[in-house]
């Protein structure tokens, strides 16, 4: 696959909306990320290119639409060899990586607030609907739309075979419009396709990976999401994603690379011969640590967000306290502190235009159009998993993952979704030191870290507790006669799947869900492995379980107090800025100093530490826009003492100055215009000249202190203005002062009339 750049230059304002509404002022918002940078979603680009290909085919040029863009509708219709040849990423602003890094460095400063960044690249457009009968605006038709500014250039990464280059280039040549209101002057674009420089980042992954240890039989890896990831669920398909990455997706990635680079299907069959292979699910993590599902025996206290109760020890609930099983979340325990980490999920809205392309939006189901939403795991999060197997299998998996860091996972990965980076963390052997991989004692706790498919003696899928217990005892090689007591805490789910090779769905079966726990007490001490897999389809990650000893022994002392439940600062990881192969991560979680639960989910207060603005940087653009806004506010504050006589006497002078400002670039030019206009012998003109000179002198005096005040208020240590910027800012302040004076004069006249 060759890499290219798709460049989109905006010839007019553009609004590409994701269907979300983020405040009460804007009815239709454009797509932008958490940092405030606008972008163009890849699915919109791919859809427009596909429409261009349809037009070209109608004009007589043959383009293999299904081969390049894939089949319309569900991507799981066909086999793996029918995937789209074209892969498009989101289109970001030119210089995005540098701007993103600058924003991350100054994260928390008022100048780099996401709203400031968004306002720097976008504008608001307000429209209404006019009644053809009355000629006036229809009631409740006023609406506001945010648009990306004309002149911006966006760049998208494209991967495709070189054989498809000419066809896609032809589509770009006729790609002229996109987005909302394209028949009303919005969305004019110029699209070009160019070759991309090969960075070599993927080939460098082998050198960056840790060495493969001798006799290694497991491999730990980290998945870093650069784009949202869709892991379709049984409940809602792509409309409701799972919040973890199934082991089957990692297994499929490895098999695909084996098939492409190591000898085809015969190499795949050889790799799968030994059933020792296990690809665990990848779960959310932070600071290099993997979090797992909260055990079913952990209960929360109603109206208490700081404490939890372990039902294994606290059977009697004090009067007035209500317990409920803790809701789904991922946890990691440190002593008695339970740290939780939630997976950030987002909804994105999409639509398919009708078969009649003259209609620009989804109208009804009968015309082939469709409006739908897709749920996905947000980009910027990290997931951790492990691959088990024989030495040969682990070596093969290591080679496949180390040779190429970038990978595309999940549903919809041909556009906008699924781009990830996989990094090998470590390898090891369970045979080197058995003490760390085993648990000894008479009391054991077996906890499912992944859903488990258990079959009973009749070869039927079962969710009977006794069948689960028998499966655990059999796997641990413990006789049922050794069992004294047991207690089972269960969660249930249903599982399915899709076989891409066959193009068929797997059967939906009931299963024990992750978080299920079995506590057993034996009449003898045993030594068992601390990790194991139960049930069926273990190769895909199902049935992963951990075995531990009890946290405390109530028989040898008082029951432990309720543990303290505290939340880690997971927002730092969830909002890491990751784009185009570069990552700017925040500090990992500090378990020694966790945030109190009251701070969970809250934004940090804006800092005003001094920063220095470099010429040509994002900070200079933001400071320029923010300073212009600040000048208007400053002028409105200073208007109260702008009059030395009655305000109404200034009215003609203020109006004339406002009208005459157009076309001037320096305030000295305005002064000459004032003298030439009012420099006559007439007493009225002398009075107007005096008023005009008062206003100009006031504007110059107040503006002289404005830069120092602005920098002090907003924590800016150095900001060098170009000479042309000084004149522009000074004229802007004069204009804002005149507008404020005009409003003040008008309000004064109205007040006098009312009196």
Where are these regions (language model features)?
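Intrinsically disordered, low-complexity regions enriched in serine, threonine, proline
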Residues: 122, 140-143, 345
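RNA-binding basic/glycine-rich loop and surface signature characteristic of RAMP-family CRISPR effectors
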Residues: 1-116, 145-351, 355, 359-363, ...
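Redox- and metal-dependent alpha/beta enzyme cores, enriched for Fe-S-associated oxidoreductases
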Residues: 449-480
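Helix-driven interaction modules
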Residues: 130-152
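A short, acidic, amphipathic alpha-helical segment used as a generic capping/interface helix at domain edges
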Residues: 136-141, 496-508
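Solvent-exposed edge beta-strands and adjacent loop segments
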Residues: 23-33, 472-502
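Short N-terminal helix-initiation segments at or just after the protein's N-terminus
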Residues: 84, 89, 133-137, 484-489
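Amphipathic alpha-helical interface segments
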Residues: 105-137
């Amino acid at each position: 696959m060759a890499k290219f750049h798709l460049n989109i230059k905006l010839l007019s304002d553009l609004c590409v909306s994701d269907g979300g509404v983020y405040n009460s002022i804007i009815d239709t918002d454009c797509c932008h990320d958490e940092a405030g940078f606008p972008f163009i979603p890849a699915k919109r680009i791919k859809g427009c290119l596909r429409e261009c290909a349809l037009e070209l085919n109608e004009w007589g040029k043959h383009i293999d639409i299904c081969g390049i863009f894939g089949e319309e509708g569900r991507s799981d219709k066909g086999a793996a060899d029918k995937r789209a040849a074209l892969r498009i990423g989101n289109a970001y602003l030119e210089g995005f990586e540098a701007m993103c890094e600058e924003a991350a460095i100054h994260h928390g400063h008022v100048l780099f607030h996401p709203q400031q960044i968004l306002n720097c690249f976008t504008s608001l457009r307000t429209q209404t609907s006019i009644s053809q009968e009355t000629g006036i605006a229809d009631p409740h038709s006023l609406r506001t739309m945010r648009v990306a500014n004309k002149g911006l250039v966006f760049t998208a990464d494209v991967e495709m075979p070189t054989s498809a280059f000419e066809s896609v280039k032809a589509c770009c040549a006729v790609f002229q419009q996109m987005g909302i209101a394209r028949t009303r002057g919005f969305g004019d674009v110029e699209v070009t396709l160019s070759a991309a420089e090969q960075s070599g980042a993927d080939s460098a992954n082998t050198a960056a990976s840790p060495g493969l240890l001798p006799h290694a039989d497991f491999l730990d890896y980290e998945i870093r999401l650069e784009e949202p990831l869709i892991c379709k669920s049984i409940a809602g398909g792509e409309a409701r994603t799972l919040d973890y990455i199934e082991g089957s997706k990692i297994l499929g990635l490895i098999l695909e690379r084996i098939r492409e680079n190591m000898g085809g299907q015969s190499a795949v069959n050889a790799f799968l011969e030994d059933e020792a292979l296990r690809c665990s699910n990848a779960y959310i993590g932070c600071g290099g640590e993997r979090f797992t599902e909260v055990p079913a025996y952990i209960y929360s206290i109603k109206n208490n967000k700081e404490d939890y109760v372990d039902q294994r020890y606290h059977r009697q609930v004090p009067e007035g306290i209500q317990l409920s099983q803790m809701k789904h979340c991922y946890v990691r325990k440190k002593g008695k502190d339970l740290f939780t980490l939630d997976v950030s999920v987002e909804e994105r809205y999409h639509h398919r235009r009708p078969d009649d392309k003259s209609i620009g939006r989804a109208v009804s189901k009968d015309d082939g159009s469709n409006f739908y939403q897709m749920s996905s795991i947000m980009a910027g999060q990290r997931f951790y998993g492990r691959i088990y197997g024989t030495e040969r299998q682990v070596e093969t998996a290591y080679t496949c993952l180390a040779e190429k860091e970038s990978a595309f996972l999940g549903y919809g990965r041909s556009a906008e979704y699924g781009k990830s980076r996989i990094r090998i963390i470590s390898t090891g052997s369970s045979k080197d030191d058995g003490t760390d991989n085993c648990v000894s004692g008479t009391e054991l706790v077996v906890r499912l870290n992944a859903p488990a498919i258990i079959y009973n003696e009749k070869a039927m899928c079962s969710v009977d507790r006794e069948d689960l217990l028998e499966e655990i005892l059999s796997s641990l090689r413990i006789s049922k006669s050794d069992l004294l007591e047991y207690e089972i805490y269960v969660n249930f789910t249903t599982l399915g799947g899709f076989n891409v090779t066959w193009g068929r769905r797997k059967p939906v079966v009931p299963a024990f869900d992750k978080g299920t726990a079995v506590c057993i007490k034996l009449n003898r001490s045993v030594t068992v492995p601390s990790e194991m897999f139960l049930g069926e389809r273990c190769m895909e990650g199902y049935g992963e379980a951990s075995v531990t000893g009890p946290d405390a022994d109530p028989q040898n002392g008082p029951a432990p107090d309720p543990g303290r439940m505290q939340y880690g600062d997971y927002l730092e990881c969830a909002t890491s800025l990751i784009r185009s192969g570069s990552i700017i991560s925040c500090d990992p979680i500090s378990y020694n100093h966790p945030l109190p639960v009251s701070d969970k989910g809250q934004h940090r207060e804006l800092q005003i530490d001094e920063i220095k603005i470099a010429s040509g940087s994002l900070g200079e653009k933001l400071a320029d826009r923010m300073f212009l806004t600040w000048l208007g506010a400053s002028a409105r504050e200073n208007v109260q003492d702008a009059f030395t006589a009655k305000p109404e006497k200034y009215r003609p002078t203020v109006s004339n100055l406002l009208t005459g400002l157009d076309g001037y670039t320096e305030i000295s030019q305005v002064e000459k215009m004032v003298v030439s206009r009012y420099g006559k012998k007439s007493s009225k003109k002398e009075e107007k000249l005096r008023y005009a000179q008062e206003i100009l002198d006031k504007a110059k005096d107040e503006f002289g202190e404005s830069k120092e005040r602005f920098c002090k208020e907003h924590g800016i240590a150095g900001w060098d203005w170009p000479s042309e910027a000084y004149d522009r800012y000074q004229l802007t302040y004069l204009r804002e002062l005149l507008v404020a004076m005009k409003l003040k004069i008008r309000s004064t006249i109205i007040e006098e009339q009312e009196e």
